């Protein structure tokens, strides 16, 4: 490892380990090398060493001869990781590290220069260039002082040594080295092509040109510009025509603020004094470097500079250690007028002052006893701890000894969150004593001020009780006014008068004081002030002045007499983190520059301008005359308004607004009326692309042949390259013999229905195209429905202005005021929606949007009477509407074309095959993506095809929008990634292109066409199985061998690779998105759009430049290195399917790192491939022979039977061992301090639309409560304190982590379909009651059920209905953490559950209404639908007893995550329809809709406010029932519940029993795309519902609580006392009585094994659990009191316990 120059932190992430983990790691490596884990660690280290050596071998070596310590070698590799550094350690130097660093910096500068260009090295490293054979570099090495002479001698000696080594055969020299060495043979000190001893400005080694010295276009300067005046450098660059100088200098930005500081990377320092700046090395007696400060500052600030008509621009591009690498560009020909007023701004950051504070410390000069102040830089964390400690000391404890003791003990080690952390910036012991004095005095000064503050507050709050108090206040107020008036006017008018009162005192003082008259004259204004304030003080005005006026006078006097005292002297401040530069370019121009040298001659400019305009006019006339026969043009020339005199020059010319160039305009004489010529002109311009290209090309050729001056014509396209024109293309009709009028697909109508499915014809090409048109129309209708819903909500006031984070990117533009009512997040939408208010129904039109600087500049139609327009996500791009418009005019007969498929694995060269086989001049080439199309164009261009490639190679969308007229045809159509498109789209492309043969490139195992409308069922979307010829390609050029091993499982035939990389994939487990490794320039890939959004925000926040795309977006792309990221723990059945796995793992050529929060199929595949040996991977290379591989599969059957009595056996140890076997490691995790650590350490949160209130919130951690101690250790979380940080964490992880719907949904149609199914399947229509809810008895019953506190709050609130803000909610978090039965508690910090609830008055309004509605729903529900509401365990068992134990069922569980947070507008509208079905009034429905649309939540306890849209509020009047309705509706929509035997549901839990063999489609994809639910479907041997197993006994089905969850909760640490434990015992004993039946116990054992993947038997542990549950005495043995003593079961009031336990007791 030492020879390879690797650090241990490079081999393993040791820096990320804790101290304990690091210790264990080294112990295993060193003491137990033969154990399994020790051998595994050795293999990891060896593999990483091999990988690093292999990677290092690919880089060119850089030999460092200087002798460096291991620490310096590590530092060098850390600062310059791109180099393969080889340390020879054979050359001792004074500053070895600095010399080695200069070599690497020189190579970095040289890398900025093109490889074949000559370079001038200013100050030069010529001996280094000789050793590398860089013959293109000429070094200018002037000997300006003795140090330079010494260096030159050293270099000559080094060169001589190289020659000696070459002659003795010890060194091999390349041809370039020999050539460079030959330059020195005659005279080693003479100038030559390699180097000279001249300055850069005086060097003539490259000769002369036009009497001026020649130089290279590129120059480098390595630490040589310090003494090079900037003006001289600019003059030399102008003379030698050098374009750019790449330079390196020591960079000390803090020198602008502080005179002395360190340079830690080189172990050096800087010091500034007497107009010079000194650079030196610490602990080094050699001479320092002295440079002019003003010149150094010019390079440090890097301001743009103008010189001799050139602008010199500074570009700092990197900081390495303490060295700044920058470039100076010479920009010629910049028009000064355009720069004269431009402002620029930048910051120079000072990284070394990060996390530091500046503390003033004081000392006494021994000789004069004068107090001296200086600033001390201290680590902020250290200072915060010290200030916090001192503030908590009492007045008696506040002594210097206590302060010194605490500072000394924490100077080297800080205890943070219970762990010892080394203080990196420790304070010097001498300064520490002075720091203690400062902190002590600061606290002593602060405490009286705080006491005065408290007294002032008490005085202000003291009531006035007597007439004396009133008169005293009035008198004091009048005196204050008089004193303030004197103070304000005294300095100007009254001083002269008042000084006359004391003339004798002033004269006496001047006479008796030495030099009195002189002092009185010099300080006359000070004397007047003293006299004036004496008068004011004499009349008592000083104490009566207003506080701000008195403070202002004090400040002026202190400034006047240079007095610096007060508490502010002790303030601890943050150091400056950056130095700001803010200037104008106009300051760069010197008035001394002459106009003749800077600007061209004005007469010459005028002549050239006239000639250019005349040429343009003639070309335009000729072109228009050839195009239009009735056109004739003439030029009308106007003279300039004034003649510009030649006497003006320089700045005078720049600052005067004059017309320099001649103006000209083109006039047109028409032979016909204006409308006719305009119509004809436009019809000629908007022609087919081919016709325009031919005319322009022919005309350009004629102009080039006939124009003697060589002027060329540049015709710019209307659409910039790389962007497709999204506006409607005017096209001729395609269908012959009929006139097609464009259907208005841009009209938006309310109440539109989804189109009917087309009739099946039997011809696949016809059916696929019809279906594609049907799909496009359905997408249009769904988008119209979403647009109309936003329009309705805004017009009805449900969506209001002033909110944030509006749904669907909503923006509302006020047409009259021309401003945004609601500003969208993004602009530049292609279309805007303009409502049409002339009609009674909801309607409008999509109009083409015209943008200017984020504002709409359309002239909207006045006749529609709309005062606002709307933009949203659905109006951003409307390409599919244009495509639908174009394709609807085509005939849909059978397509006469043969279709071929090249079915290839990822990276097999499908695009290369197109480039090699297609001729774009005669074939049509299409691709589904813009990037892939550009790549094809670039590769075709490299082969030199003579045709217009952008006309022949297009994206599919561009082809369907612009080429339906037949302008692009060919016998052969090449279609890249054809399987990603709808089959109808492929058929349309073949029809339009007139192709006889369509060659499709694709992969049947990768991502196919995905519809964006979830409600359409597509039957003809795929071409798989419809191809005439299928050619398989199973050799990949992209994927490494381990990826080929994964792909081989999913493809027919053997997958082989040409990539020489064997192992390329690794898995990195992360806890959250915060731990994603952020690498500049990396390619990140995510599965979901929501994950992409999170990652983009994270990269933007950390200012890391990298690309992010989803797996779907990256299909067809190739990257060298990929970071695949999963930040969502929930499983998405669509985005995490097999096809996504294949695409995700096959995008890279070198490496892939999968960073995931959860183990899944992707990580499993990666780990399995990583476990393959080299021999196993060898078979996947193309060169290896194919090896046969056989696998065996076994089916395992289990059957247990034999009931008997449950024995009274088992111990606490049995329970603990069983739990540890189920969840290894959970019992070792102590979470008691988790909440405290989170509250007291830094936490980075990204929250949108949240307002927090800072303040001294109650220290909840000071509250001490005593609880019983559990004997069993489980992962049952501790109670947490509900702090502000916990509130924000819960908001981020729950309310702001809701998924976004990615597809279009026609909400109106889906609601109608769902309501229809509810009536036919769930409810008995005859029992549905829809009469108005006016039941007074129901209201009174609800009122009686409320507590007296709630009744008092409602009665005290006297607001009317219109005064209540229904959209405002309270927000709180629960202190109890939901226990988890998996391994996540070991590494995951769970967020607390949030409760969002209305105030009591609103609940009193809606509570009785929803109670009545829910009773009506239960009365009308079919009997086999079991709604788990207000049911005990026995009630639930009674409802499922009808299930036949002899019948076979398929039980289906649907697990939904983030359920109530996934609600959107559609869910709200559906819920309102259900309420209306059971009698809800419209006024109440409107109030409920308003209260759930645009809402504000406030956490008053913790000072937080947030904005939330549509989410189901977890504490409103109908939370549980509304969630249950949504679950039922979603399952009803996507599953055949009409076939179900039993449907049990409640909240987000559900269990459905189907007859065995019932066929249905996995509902999870539709639940995700239509209902916005992230879910998983389970089919276990034993189903579970609401934490209870549904067990089949000999006589019936029975729900039994999950014993694992029961045992987990027995580790609860918040049970107060034995009385509380008795209440828990009653509840436990009642709900777990089934454990007394051994038949249940045996079934439970199987259930646990099936659910938790437990391989052992659980009967013994279940027996032990029942033993401790059935007896309260045994239960008491599971806990100890606060003194760690056994509990006394006799100390229980059982009557009180029985009263406390209700039917729904939750412990």
UniProtKB/Swiss-Prot annotation:
Keyword Coiled coil (UniProt): yes
Entry's transmembrane regions: none
Chain spans, region Methyltransferase: 65-425
Domain ((+)RNA virus helicase ATP-binding) ranges: 872-1033
(+)RNA virus helicase C-terminal domain sequence ranges: 1034-1187
Alphavirus-like MT domain residues: 86-300
Ranges in a coiled coil: 601-622
Signal peptide residue numbers: none
EC number of the protein: 2.1.1.-, 2.7.7.-, 2.7.7.48, 3.6.4.13
Domain RdRp catalytic, chain residue ranges per copy: 1449-1562
Cross-referenced Pfam families: RdRP_2, Viral_helicase1, Vmethyltransf
Gene Ontology MF: a single term: RNA-directed RNA polymerase activity
Additional comment: The replicase large subunit is translated as a fusion protein by episodic readthrough of a termination codon. When readthrough of the terminator codon TGA occurs between the codons for 1187-Lys and 1189-Arg, this results in the addition of the RdRp region.
Family: Belongs to the ssRNA positive-strand viruses RNA-directed RNA polymerase family.
Protein's name in the database: Replicase large subunit
Organism: Tobacco rattle virus (strain SYM)
């Amino acid at each position: 490892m030492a020879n390879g120059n690797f650090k241990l932190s490079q081999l393993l992430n040791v820096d990320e380990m804790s101290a304990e983990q690091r210790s264990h790691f080294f112990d295993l490596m060193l003491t137990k090398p033969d154990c399994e884990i020790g051998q595994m660690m050795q293999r990891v280290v060896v593999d990483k060493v091999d990988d690093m050596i292999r990677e290092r071998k690919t880089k060119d070596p850089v030999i460092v001869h200087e002798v460096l310590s291991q620490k310096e070698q590590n530092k060098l590799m850390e600062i310059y990781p791109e180099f393969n550094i080889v340390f020879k350690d054979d050359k001792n130097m004074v500053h070895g590290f600095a010399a080695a660093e200069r070599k690497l910096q020189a190579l970095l500068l040289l890398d900025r220069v093109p490889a074949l260009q000559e370079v001038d090295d200013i100050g030069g490293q010529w001996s280094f260039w000789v050793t590398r054979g860089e013959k293109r570099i000429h070094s200018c090495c002037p000997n300006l002082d003795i140090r330079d002479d010494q260096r030159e001698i050293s270099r000559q000696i080094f060169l001589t040594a190289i020659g000696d080594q070459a002659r003795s055969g010890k060194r091999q020299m390349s041809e370039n080295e020999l050539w460079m060495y030959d330059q020195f043979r005659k005279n080693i000190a003479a100038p030559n092509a390699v180097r000279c001893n001249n300055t850069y400005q005086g060097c003539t080694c490259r000769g002369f040109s036009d009497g001026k010295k020649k130089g290279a276009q590129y120059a480098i300067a390595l630490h040589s510009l310090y003494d090079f005046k900037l003006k001289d450098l600019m003059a030399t660059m102008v003379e030698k025509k050098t374009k750019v100088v790449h330079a390196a200098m020591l960079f000390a930005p803090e020198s602008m603020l502080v005179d002395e500081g360190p340079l830690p990377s080189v172990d050096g320092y800087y010091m500034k004094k007497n107009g010079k700046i000194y650079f030196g090395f610490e602990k080094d007696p050699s001479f320092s470097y002295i440079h002019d400060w003003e010149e150094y500052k010019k390079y440090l600030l890097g301001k743009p500079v103008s010189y001799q008509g050139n602008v010199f621009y500074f570009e700092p591009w990197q900081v390495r250690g303490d060295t700044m690498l920058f470039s100076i560009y010479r920009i010629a020909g910049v028009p000064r007028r355009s720069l004269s007023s431009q402002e620029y701004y930048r910051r120079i950051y000072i990284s070394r002052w990060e996390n530091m504070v500046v503390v003033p410390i004081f000392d006494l000069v021994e000789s004069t006893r004068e107090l001296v102040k200086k600033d001390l830089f201290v680590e902020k964390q250290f200072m915060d701890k010290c200030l916090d400690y001192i503030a908590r000391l009492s007045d008696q404890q506040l002594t210097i000894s206590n302060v010194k003791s605490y500072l000394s003990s924490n100077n080297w080690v800080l205890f943070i969150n219970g762990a010892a952390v080394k203080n990196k910036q420790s304070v010097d012991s001498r300064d520490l004593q002075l720091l203690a004095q400062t902190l002590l005095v600061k606290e002593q000064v602060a405490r009286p001020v705080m006491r005065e503050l408290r007294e002032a507050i008490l005085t202000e709050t003291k009531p006035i009780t007597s007439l004396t108090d009133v008169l005293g206040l009035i008198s004091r107020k009048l005196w204050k006014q008089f004193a303030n008036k004197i103070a304000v006017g005294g300095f100007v008018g009254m001083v002269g008068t008042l000084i006359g009162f004391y003339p004798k005192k002033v004269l006496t003082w001047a006479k008796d004081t030495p030099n009195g008259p002189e002092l009185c004259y010099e300080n006359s204004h000070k004397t007047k002030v003293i006299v004036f304030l004496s008068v004011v003080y004499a009349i008592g005005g000083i104490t009566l002045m207003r506080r701000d006026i008195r403070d202002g006078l004090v400040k002026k006097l202190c400034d006047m007499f240079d007095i610096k005292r007060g508490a502010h002297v002790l303030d601890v401040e943050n150091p400056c983190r950056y130095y700001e530069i803010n200037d104008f370019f106009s300051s760069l121009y010197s008035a001394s520059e002459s106009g003749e040298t800077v600007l061209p001659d004005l007469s010459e400019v005028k002549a050239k301008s006239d000639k250019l305009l005349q040429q343009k006019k003639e070309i335009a006339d000729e072109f228009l005359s050839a195009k239009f026969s009735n056109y004739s043009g003439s030029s009308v020339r106007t003279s300039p308004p004034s003649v510009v005199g030649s006497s003006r020059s320089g700045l005078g010319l720049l600052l005067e607004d004059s017309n320099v160039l001649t103006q000209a305009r083109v006039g047109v004489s028409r032979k016909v009326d204006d409308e006719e010529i305009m119509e004809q002109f436009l019809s000629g311009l908007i022609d087919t692309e081919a016709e325009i290209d031919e005319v322009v090309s022919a005309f350009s050729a004629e102009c080039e042949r006939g124009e003697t001056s060589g002027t060329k014509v540049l015709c710019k396209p209307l659409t910039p390259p790389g962007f497709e024109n999204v506006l409607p293309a005017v096209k001729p009709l395609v269908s012959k013999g009929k006139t097609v009028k464009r259907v208005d697909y841009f009209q938006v109508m309310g109440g539109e229905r989804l189109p009917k499915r087309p009739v099946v014809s039997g011809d696949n090409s016809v059916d696929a195209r019809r279906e594609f048109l049907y799909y496009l129309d359905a997408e249009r209708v769904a988008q119209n429905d979403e647009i109309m819903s936003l329009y309705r909500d805004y017009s009805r006031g449900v969506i209001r202005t002033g909110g944030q984070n509006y749904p669907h990117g909503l923006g509302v533009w006020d047409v009259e005021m021309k401003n945004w009512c609601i500003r969208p997040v993004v602009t530049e939408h292609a279309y805007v929606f303009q409502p049409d208010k002339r009609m009674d129904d909801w309607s409008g039109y999509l109009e083409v949007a015209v943008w200017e600087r984020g504002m709409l500049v359309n002239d909207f139609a006045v006749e529609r009477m709309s005062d606002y327009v709307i933009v949203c996500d659905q109006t951003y791009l409307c390409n599919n509407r244009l495509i639908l418009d174009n394709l609807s005019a085509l005939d849909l007969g059978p397509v006469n074309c043969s279709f071929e498929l090249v079915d290839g694995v990822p990276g097999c060269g499908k695009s290369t095959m197109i480039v090699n086989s297609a001729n774009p001049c005669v074939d049509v080439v299409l691709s589904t993506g813009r990037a892939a199309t550009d790549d094809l164009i670039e590769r075709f261009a490299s082969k030199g095809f003579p045709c217009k490639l952008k006309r022949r190679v297009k994206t599919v969308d561009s082809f369907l929008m612009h080429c339906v007229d037949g302008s692009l045809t060919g016998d052969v159509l090449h279609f890249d990634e054809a399987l990603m498109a709808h089959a109808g789209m492929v058929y349309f492309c073949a029809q339009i292109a007139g192709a006889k043969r369509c060659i499709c490139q694709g992969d049947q195992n990768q991502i196919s066409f995905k519809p964006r409308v979830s409600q359409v069922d597509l039957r003809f979307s795929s071409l798989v199985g419809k191809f005439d010829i299928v050619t398989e390609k199973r050799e990949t050029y992209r994927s490494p061998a381990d990826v080929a091993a994964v792909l081989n499982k999913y493809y027919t035939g053997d997958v082989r690779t040409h990539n020489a990389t064997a192992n390329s994939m690794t898995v990195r487990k992360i806890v959250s998105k915060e731990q994603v490794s952020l690498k500049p320039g990396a390619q990140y890939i995510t599965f979901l759009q929501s994950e992409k959004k999170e990652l983009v925000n994270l990269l933007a926040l950390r200012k890391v430049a990298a690309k992010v795309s989803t797996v779907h977006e990256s299909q067809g792309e190739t990257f060298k290195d990929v970071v695949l990221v999963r930040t969502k723990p929930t499983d998405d059945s669509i985005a995490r399917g097999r096809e996504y796995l294949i695409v995700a793992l096959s995008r890279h050529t070198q490496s892939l790192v999968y960073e995931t929060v959860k183990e899944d199929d992707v990580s499993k595949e990666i780990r399995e491939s990583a476990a393959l040996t080299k021999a196993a991977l060898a078979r996947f290379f193309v060169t290896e022979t194919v090896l046969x591989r056989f696998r065996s599969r076994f089916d395992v059957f289990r059957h247990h039977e034999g009931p008997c009595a449950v024995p009274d056996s088992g111990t606490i140890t049995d329970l603990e061992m069983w739990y540890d076997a189920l969840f290894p490691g959970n019992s070792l995790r102590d979470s008691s301090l988790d909440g405290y650590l989170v509250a007291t350490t830094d936490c980075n949160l990204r929250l949108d639309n949240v307002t927090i209130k800072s303040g001294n919130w109650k220290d909840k951690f000071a509250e001490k409560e005593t609880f019983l101690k559990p004997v069993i250790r489980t992962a049952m979380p501790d109670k947490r304190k509900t702090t502000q940080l916990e509130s924000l964490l819960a908001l981020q992880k729950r309310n702001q982590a809701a998924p976004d719907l990615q597809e279009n949904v026609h909400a109106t149609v889906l609601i109608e379909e769902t309501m229809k199914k509810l009536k036919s399947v769930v409810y008995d229509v005859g029992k549905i009651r829809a009469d108005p809810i006016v039941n007074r008895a129901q209201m009174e019953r609800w009122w009686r059920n409320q507590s007296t506190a709630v009744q008092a709050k409602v009665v005290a609130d006297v607001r009317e209905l219109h005064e209540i803000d229904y959209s405002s909610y309270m927000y709180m978090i629960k202190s109890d953490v939901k226990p988890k039965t998996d391994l996540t508690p070991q590494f995951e910090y769970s967020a607390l559950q949030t409760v969002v609830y209305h105030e009591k008055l609103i609940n009193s309004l809606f509570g009785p209404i929803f109670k009545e509605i829910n009773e009506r729903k239960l009365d009308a529900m079919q009997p086999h639908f079991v709604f788990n509401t207000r049911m005990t365990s026995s009630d639930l068992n009674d409802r499922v007893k009808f299930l036949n134990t002899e019948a076979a069922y398929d039980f289906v569980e649907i697990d939904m995550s983030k359920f109530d947070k996934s609600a959107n507008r559609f869910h709200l509208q559906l819920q309102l329809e259900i309420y209306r079905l059971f009698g809800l009034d419209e006024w109440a429905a409107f109030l409920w809709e308003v209260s759930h649309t645009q809402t504000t939540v406030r956490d008053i306890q913790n000072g937080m406010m947030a904005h939330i849209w549509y989410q189901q509020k977890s504490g409103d009047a109908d939370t549980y029932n509304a969630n249950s309705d949504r679950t039922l509706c979603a399952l009803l929509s996507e599953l055949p519940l009409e076939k179900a035997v039993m449907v049990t549901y409640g909240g987000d839990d559900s269990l459905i029993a189907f007859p065995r063999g019932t066929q249905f489609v996995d509902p999870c994809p539709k639940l995700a795309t239509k209902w916005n639910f992230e879910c998983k479907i389970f089919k276990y041997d034993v189903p579970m519902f609401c934490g209870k197993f549904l067990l089949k006994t000999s006589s019936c089905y029975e729900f039994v609580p999950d014993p694992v969850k029961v045992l987990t909760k027995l580790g609860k640490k918040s049970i107060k006392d034995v009385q509380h434990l008795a209440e828990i015992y009653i509840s436990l004993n009642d709900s777990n009585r089934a454990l007394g039946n051994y038949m249940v116990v045996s079934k439970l054992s199987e259930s646990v094994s099936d659910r938790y993947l437990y391989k052992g038997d659980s009967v013994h542990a279940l027996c032990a659990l029942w033993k401790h549950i059935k007896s309260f005495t045994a239960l008491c043995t599971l806990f100890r009191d606060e003194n760690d003593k056994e509990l006394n079961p006799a100390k229980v009031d059982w009557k009180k316990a029985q009263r406390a336990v209700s039917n729904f007791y939750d412990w």
